Regions:
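Short, surface-exposed acidic-centric catalytic microdomains
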Residues: 14-37
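Conserved small/polar residues in nucleotide/adenosyl-binding loops
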Residues: 261-263
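A charged helix-plus-loop insertion that forms the helical arch/lid used to bind
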Residues: 31-47, 86-97
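Long, compositionally biased charged/polar accessory segments in the mid-to-C-terminal portions
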Residues: 175-241, 249, 253-256
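Short catalytic helix/loop segments, enriched in acidic residues and glycine
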Residues: 1-12
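N-terminal glycine-rich phosphate/adenylate-binding segment common to multiple enzyme folds
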Residues: 56-90
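Divalent-metal-activated hydrolytic enzyme cores
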Residues: 44-59, 94-160
Length: 263
């Protein structure tokens, strides 16, 4: 799916930290190992590659910042790229699963508000859809930033995403609205934008529920209902209800709404 479908809309930047750091192929298997509070990346024979991988990671992350990265997908459980639950070997021979890959750690620290997921979670359609939505939202945010942040541009961005945000969290959407309604609480537009982005990111991380999607569909239907004849209005209501009952996918009422909006 990511290669055959998503590639039509994004430019992938393939990265293998071990290869790019000079470890070559084929290479010895590496793993995370903990020594006190220090986590290292070692081969099974004990050769330490931590400084090499970490030094590479810091340089690569700076290059990705210049490339305006809009999101990233990482390899799960990888000692370099795993975002969470990476096995960490202890000195007593036990293994914990609370590690984070060396490269992933640097990337996530540098881009705390950029969408990221592990490839294994992309098999879940809801998580995949949520991630892709966040990538496009991030791309558009970077466009807003590149043209110069203003209160008006923040308001325009929020209006464009209002209903998608409502599907993720109605309370979160209200918080964002209140934030933009009180810009004088912030010393500069940049501080306002930073606060907005933090909250926007938190809201978008929440997977939309069917109930919230239904509420948004009904809300949007209200804008066009007065322009519809009774049969079309009933059909739209029926489509939304069938989605709510899990008898139709979301795309069906969405496409119908779009067709009615453009009549």
């Amino acid at each position: 799916y990511l290669v055959d479908v998503v590639s039509r809309y994004v430019e992938w930047v393939p990265i293998c930290p071990e290869v790019e750091a000079g470890m070559g192929t084929p290479r010895d298997t590496v793993q995370l190992a903990q020594f006190g509070s220090d986590i290292r990346i070692l081969t099974k024979e004990g050769i330490d590659h931590t400084e090499v991988i970490d030094g590479y990671a810091q340089k690569r992350v700076k290059a990705l910042e210049r490339a305006k990265l809009s999101g990233y997908i990482m390899k799960s459980r990888s000692p370099s790229c795993g975002m969470d639950r990476v096995p960490v070997f202890q000195t007593d021979g036990s293994t914990s699963r609370n590690g984070r890959g060396i490269f992933a750690k640097r990337l996530m620290e540098a881009f705390p508000h950029r969408p990221g997921e592990e490839e294994i979670r992309m098999h879940n359609p809801r998580l995949r859809e949520n991630f892709i939505s966040r990538v496009f939202a991030c791309y558009r945010w970077l466009q807003v930033v590149s043209t110069g942040l203003t209160r008006d541009s923040l308001m325009s961005y929020h209006r464009a995403y209002k209903y998608l945000l409502m599907a993720h969290s109605q309370e979160g959407t209200r918080r964002l609205g209140r934030l933009l309604a009180n810009p004088d609480h912030y010393a500069t537009t940049q501080e306002l934008a930073d606060a907005y982005l933090r909250e926007f990111t938190n809201v978008m991380k929440r997977t939309p529920s069917r109930r919230n999607h239904t509420n948004v569909l009904q809300h949007m239907a209200g804008y066009v209902s007065d322009q519809l004849d009774s049969n079309t209005r009933r059909e739209l209501t029926r489509m939304i209800q069938k989605y709510r009952e899990e008898l139709l996918p979301l795309i069906v009422p969405v496409v119908m709404l779009l067709s009615l909006i453009h009549i």
